Amino acid sequence: MRTGVIAKKVGMTRLFQEDGRHVPVTVLKLEDVQVVAVKNKDQDGYVAVQLGAGSAKAKNVTKPVRGHFAKAEVELKAKLVEFPVSEDAVLEVGTSISADHFIAGQLVDISGQTQGKGFAGAMKRWGFGGLRATHGVSLSHRSHGSTGNRQDPGRVFKNKKMAGHMGARQRTQQNLEVISTDAERDLIFVRGSVPGSKGAWLIIRDAVKVARPTDAPYPAAIKAANGNEAPAAPVAAEGQEG
């Protein structure tokens, strides 16, 4: 199992295929995605890599977190995410990951926070049909109706579908197809829509329900110092040498 990446949602557009058909895609951008920390079994009990993306001002980062980045000798990041990986997929701290980490035709899972819609009624939030237009119904045509039973249990059950805040929930869309990538501009084009608004941070992983393509870079597509893609160089997790 290899690491995923952190990307920022740019927006939607369309790409034309060779036969003239157009495909609606979401544009995702990798902004200076680097390995900030590595977790190992001896010290942490599990193996993982912590990635950082974007950039942050020092005044917006707490002193302990600034020390965390200073230890890794990387710039301050706006977003930190930890990815569990196999022992042979551990990357060195400071490694930069390219958009070629995923390949065209590959299926990925994308997680993010959905767009917030504010306070919404039961018809918009849950698709309820509402009450009748006439026959005794007054001022309650779009209400959700009864919410409970009788004296027993004498309460409204938890998770009852009612009016409330709609959206702004962490959600994952599975098996989205990667149409193409642009390593020079660090862009990934994914078929269809993904959770989140423009500018939102998203987490992209290999699909869990479909096998990873055999020609996908393993353990990662790494940027060389000159900005070009370099072959991946896995390192053993601390305490796993020998």
Swiss-Prot record:
Keyword Cytoplasm: no
Residues recorded with modification N5-methylglutamine: Q151
GO terms (BP aspect): translation
Annotated signal sequence range: none
One Gene Ontology term of the molecular function aspect: structural constituent of ribosome
SUPFAM superfamilies to which the protein is assigned, alphabetical: Translation proteins
PTM description: Methylated by PrmB.
Keywords in alphabetical order: Methylation, Ribonucleoprotein, Ribosomal protein, RNA-binding, rRNA-binding
GO cellular component, one term: cytosolic large ribosomal subunit
Pfam family, one: Ribosomal_L3
Family recorded in the similarity comment: Belongs to the universal ribosomal protein uL3 family.
Primary role: One of the primary rRNA binding proteins, it binds directly near the 3'-end of the 23S rRNA, where it nucleates assembly of the 50S subunit.
Assembly description: Part of the 50S ribosomal subunit. Forms a cluster with proteins L14 and L19.
Protein name: Large ribosomal subunit protein uL3
Species per Swiss-Prot/TrEMBL record: Zymomonas mobilis subsp. mobilis (strain ATCC 31821 / ZM4 / CP4)
Lineage: Bacteria, Pseudomonadati, Pseudomonadota, Alphaproteobacteria, Sphingomonadales
